[in-house]
Amino acid sequence: MARRNLADAADGLKRRLREGDVLVKAVLEAEDDPLTLRRQIALKMILNAHSTGVMAAVGRVVGNTMTNVSPTNLKLIGRATYLIMTHVNDTLAQRDWVAAHGFADAVTFAEANAVLFDAMEYVRSHEMGQTAEVALSIIRMLEAFQRRAPASWDDARALLESDGLAGYLARHNPRLAT
C-alpha cells in the first residue's frame, strides 16, 4: 500500500513539472542501516545541495559564501560576524584597494560583531524585513574605510538596494568580479 502511494505521489509530481525543471531521484537502500543514518545523511546532503543551488540562483552567494545569514541565534551571529570580517578584510587586502584608499588594519571579530549588532538594530527599527544584516554591515564598513569617515546606515542601504552585495564587492574586490 505504501509503495503504491509513493508511486502515485511521484506520478503527480511528474505531471506538475515544467520545462526546465529537473527531477532528482535518489535510491537509498535501508539494508544494514537499522537506524537509517545513511538515509538521513544522504537526505541532508541532497537538501543542502538544493538550498545552495537556490541561494545561488537568487543571488545570495558572493564568492564561495552564502551571505544571506539571518543572525537569530548565537551560532548564526558567529557565522554572520565571521562573514563580515572575512569579506571586509579580503577587500581591504586587495592591491587595487590599497592603491586607491591606502592600507588599513584588518577588522577584528569584535569590531565586525559590534557592527553586526548595530545593523540588527537598524534593520529592526526601520522594519526592513528581509534586508540582510551581513550585506549591510559589509558595505557600511567598506564605505567608512573608503571615505575615512563614518558612513551612515542609510547610505549603506541605498548602495545595497542599487548594487546588491555581489555588485558592490565586485567593484571593490577584483577577486570577486565574475
Where are the predicted features?
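Glycine-rich phosphate-binding loops that contact phosphosugars or nucleotide phosphates
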Residues: 1-45, 51-58
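Glycine-rich phosphate/diphosphate-binding loops and the adjacent beta-loop-alpha structural elements
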Residues: 30-37, 41, 52-177
